[in-house]
Amino acid sequence: MSLQAPHPSTPRMLRVAAAAHALAAVLLVVGRAGYGGRPRGLIGDMADNPWWALIHLAAAAALLASTHHPDARTWAAWLSAFTMTAWSVLLLWWAANLEPDGTWLAGTFGLIVAAISTTLATRED
């Protein structure tokens, strides 16, 4: 445990990454309710699997908890980075092969959030 206080922007960045995961979960639920495009093929089924919503909510909860428990920040940020990277790669793969629409935007957004989470995981305060 570090006796040094974290950088002032660290809790804010953790909350932004948590909000991004919560938004991803909401988008997945709304899409499954019929407001978005239906997945086609194996890649689409993997990218739009309902378990992703729960995984994103778990990552968001871990990130929010780590704002109060700095010792948990590294593993929470790595969980966020791996989750968002895997989901984004599936989205981009889906968009490239099957459905080139707003899926590109969601996949790119996810990779940006994954980069933020990786920065948080490797940051020395």
Residue ranges with predicted function:
Residues L14, P39-H56:
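A loop-to-helix transmembrane entry motif
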Residues A61-W75:
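Juxtamembrane helix-break-helix junctions at the cytosolic face
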Residues L3, N97, I116-S117:
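Charged interaction scaffolds used for protein-protein
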Residues L23-G34:
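Alpha-helical transmembrane segments of multi-pass membrane proteins
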Residues P70-D71, W78-A106, A121-D125:
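Membrane-helix boundary connector in multi-pass membrane proteins
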Residues L111-D125:
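Membrane-water interface at the C-terminal end of transmembrane alpha helices
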